[in-house]
Every structure is written in structure tokens, then in C-alpha cells.
Swiss-Prot record:
EC number: 2.5.1.6
Residues engaged in binding Mg(2+): 19
Native organism taxonomy: Bacteria, Bacillati, Bacillota, Bacilli, Bacillales
GO biological process, one term: S-adenosylmethionine biosynthetic process
Protein name: S-adenosylmethionine synthase
Cofactor(s) this protein cannot do without: Mg(2+); K(+)
Annotated source species: Bacillus cereus (strain ATCC 14579 / DSM 31 / CCUG 7414 / JCM 2152 / NBRC 15305 / NCIMB 9373 / NCTC 2599 / NRRL B-3711)
InterPro entries per the UniProt record, alphabetical: ADOMET_SYNTHASE_CS (IPR022631), S-AdoMet_synt_C (IPR022630), S-AdoMet_synt_central (IPR022629), S-AdoMet_synt_N (IPR022628), S-AdoMet_synthetase (IPR002133), S-AdoMet_synthetase_sfam (IPR022636)
Location in or out of the cell: Cytoplasm
NCBIfam families in UniProt: metK (TIGR01034)
GO cellular component, one term: cytosol
Length: 399
């Protein structure tokens, strides 16, 4: 039988990408507030352009944080430290425009919220409604050890490595902005078999040659990350394919919070409900329910109930219970999807306050998620990446 060729591509970006700068600023502000006021309501949006940062949104809190200071520290940590980059931590202007959360929204969410989740009764959890309507997806598959699709997993690792060799001066001519993209070939059974194409674009010092960049990235980035057995003589490499990438960061492109939602999740391999994560506290189901859906999907796959699983949750504003829960195993399930939905209902509390309690989401843990993906992370300890429900799911499924 002739082998059917099936390619799938995902991309990632470095922490110096303009949109990712914004995500990190928004989540740094969120973390700073949560560290002092765990019950704060935060929706923080950031935009950056040449020499300017604008922070806007709705924040309701009993504490004070120095937003311009947080902004500058975040930019400094990313590596925009020189004015000749067109954007730097010391000289950029920082404007803020912050309101309180709308009373109309708060009305549907606030009941019993002053109670700590750990001490809340079921009635109190039921009284806390979702902060908005919407649909959220979570996904897991057995392509990698972290139960993520291989293309996005490799793209994130390349982007992280690009930053590492810049910051440790292995390749001191690199600058903060950069993107990676990986195309993986799948066989007729849907299994990843090889890397077909790797694309890396990285900002750099004007005096370095393309030949140096091409050689160094293959040696210090690609070889360090991509397993040799996945590459062959047919694997294609496109390193800075325009030939030059000196002007970058916010000087090259304006950035906005929430513009890299596919990078943040599954690289396009699974569906997406459209809601962004960064800058939002856990009462926003855009964030917390997407984390919960990943937690559910990962435990289904870890339990061996399916090779891949996509979980959809949906909510109505002011209503605690999800209006729908669905599971799609793409024909790989060991039990029916109806059984899986029932297992999910019995083992996971998917009401907003239940999710916050289950995943302990009132902590200042979010900046670390704002670059290199929110899922499949092995470098940080994230509660939604645990597989502590897998054994119970397997037992209850009778496997």
C-alpha cells in the first residue's frame, strides 16, 4: 500500500516577541496583585509599540501595585535593555488606564466569593457563577511524554533554546525577538515519524552574517533540541529566510495581549474556543476552564482510556454549572464517549469555584505560563498538568 503523506505544522515565539511581551506584562501584573490579594478581580490588557507601553483593563482589588515598575522589570528580564533596540525598559513610556470591574459582571460572580475556596460549602461553590459565557477546549495525546502534540512541543523547545543561548551568551549576537515553526510528517496510522521542516527567524546584531547565524542555530539550537532520529537528509531548514532580521520587537511590530492563543495552547492541533489567557484571574473561565479541560483530557489519556482526547466545556455568565461537557477521542477511545462524559462529571468539579479549588488557581503562578506555552510544561509545576485522577478514571471505566 502506498504510504499517505500527512504533514502538520505548529509555531512558537520567544519571550521577546511583541505579543508575548504583552502577555508577560499582563501576567506579571496579575501575579503581583494575587500575591497580596488572592481574591482580586483582574482583566489586564497590554499593548506595546516603539518606545511605548499601554496597560488598560478592569482591576478590582484591595491592594496597590506599582504597575510602571512591574512593566519595566518585566521588559528588563526579557532583555530589552538598550535604546538602540527601539524599545528598552528604562526609556519606554508607560501609560496606564485602569477601571474597576463592571458591577453588572460582578453581580453574577460575587456571591460567597469572600469565602476561601478551601472552606466553601457545596452551596457556596454553586453560588459563584461563571464570569462570562464561552466555550473552552482541552486536549491531550500520547505523541510525547508530556501528552502534547509533537509539532508544538518541538516548536516551544526551539523557542526556549533560542532564548537560552541568547541569555547565556552562547550566541551573544542574538536579540530578544524570534519565532520557530516545526512541520512533522505523520504516517498512515497518524503517528509522527519524522520532522519535515524547521523554520527559525531570530532578531540579531547588524554585524553578524547570515552564514554565521545559519551554522550556529543548527549547531546550538536545533541539534540541542530535536532528536536526531526525527531528522534525515530530506529535512528542510529555513533559518532567517529573509536574510536579515535586525529591526524587531515592538519597533518592528506592535504587540497586544492575547494575540498568540494558538501558540499558548496546542499549535492548531486541537480546536480553540477563542478566549485568551494572560492578564485574567481565575474567575474568568476563558483561562480557568481551559486549564480544567486540559487537566481532564490529560488524565483521560494518562489513564489509557484514549490515545487522544479533546474536551469541550461551555458556560453561561452567572451560572455555575457548565452548560455542556463533551469528549471527542477521534476513534481512539477504549470506552464510549458517553461513558467518558459521565466519568468526567463524577470526578471533576467543573464549576468555576470548583475549578479554582481543584487546581489551586488563586496563587501568583501565571507569569511563568506567559511564554513557551501553558500546557505540556516540564520546567514548571502546574496543577493542571498533574495526572492524579488517571488511576480512578481507569478503575471506574473497568479497565
Amino acid at each position: 500500500m502506498t504510504k499517505k503523506r500527512h504533514l502538520f505544522t505548529s509555531e512558537s515565539v520567544t519571550e521577546g516577541h511583541p505579543d508575548k511581551i504583552c502577555d508577560q506584562i499582563s501576567d506579571s501584573i496579575l501575579d503581583a496583585i494575587l500575591s497580596k490579594d488572592a481574591n482580586a478581580r483582574v482583566a489586564c490588557e497590554t499593548t506595546v509599540t516603539t518606545g511605548l507601553v499601554l496597560v488598560a483593563g478592569e482591576i478590582t482589588t484591595s491592594t496597590y501595585v506599582d504597575i510602571p515598575k512591574i512593566v519595566r522589570e518585566t521588559i528588563q528580564g526579557i532583555g530589552y535593555t538598550r535604546a538602540k533596540y527601539g524599545f528598552d525598559a528604562e526609556t519606554c513610556a508607560v501609560l496606564t488606564s485602569i477601571d474597576e470591574q463592571s458591577a453588572d459582571i460582578a453581580m453574577g460572580v460575587d456571591q460567597a466569593l469572600e469565602a476561601r475556596e478551601g472552606q466553601m460549602t457545596d452551596a457556596e461553590i454553586e453560588a459563584i457563577g461563571a464570569g462570562d459565557q464561552g466555550l473552552m477546549f482541552g486536549f491531550a495525546c500520547n505523541e510525547t511524554q508530556e501528552l502534547m502534540p509533537l509539532p508544538i512541543s518541538l516548536a516551544h523547545k526551539l523557542a526556549r533554546r533560542l532564548t537560552e543561548v541568547r541569555k547565556d551568551d552562547t550566541l551573544s549576537y542574538l536579540r530578544p525577538d524570534g519565532k520557530t515553526q516545526v512541520t512533522v510528517e505523520y504516517d498512515e496510522n497518524g503517528k509522527p515519524v519524522r520532522v519535515d521542516t524547521i523554520v527559525i527567524s531570530t532578531q540579531h546584531h547588524p554585524d553578524v552574517t547570515w552564514e554565521e547565524i545559519d551554522r550556529d542555530l543548527k549547531e546550538h539550537v536545533i541539534k540541542a533540541v530535536v532528536p536526531a532520529e526525527l531528522m534525515d537528509g530530506e529535512t528542510k531548514f529555513f533559518i532567517n529566510p529573509t536574510g536579515r532580521f535586525v529591526i524587531g520587537g515592538p519597533q518592528g511590530d506592535a504587540g497586544l495581549t492575547g494575540r498568540k492563543i494558538i501558540v499558548d495552547t496546542y499549535g492548531g492541533y486541537a480546536r480553540h474556543g477563542g478566549g485568551a489567557f494572560s492578564g485574567k484571574d481565575a474567575t474568568k473561565v476563558d483561562r480557568s476552564a481551559a486549564y480544567a479541560a486540559r487537566y481532564v483530557a490529560k488524565n483521560i489519556v494518562a489513564a489509557g482510556l484514549a490515545e487522544k482526547a479533546e474536551v469541550q466545556l461551555a458556560y453561561a455568565i452567572g451560572v455555575a454549572q457548565p452548560v455542556s461537557i463533551s469528549v471527542d477521542t477521534f476513534g481512539t477511545g477504549k470506552v464510549s464517549e458517553d461513558v467518558l462524559v459521565e466519568l468526567v462529571r463524577n470526578n471533576f468539579d467543573l464549576r468555576p469555584a470548583g475549578i479554582i479549588k481543584m487546581l489551586d488557581l488563586r496563587r501568583p503562578i501565571y507569569k511563568q505560563t506567559a511564554a513557551y506555552g501553558h500546557f505540556g510544561r516540564t520546567d514548571v509545576d502546574l496543577s493542571w498538568e498533574r495526572t492524579d485522577k488517571a488511576a480512578a478514571l481507569k478503575e471506574q471505566a473497568g479497565l
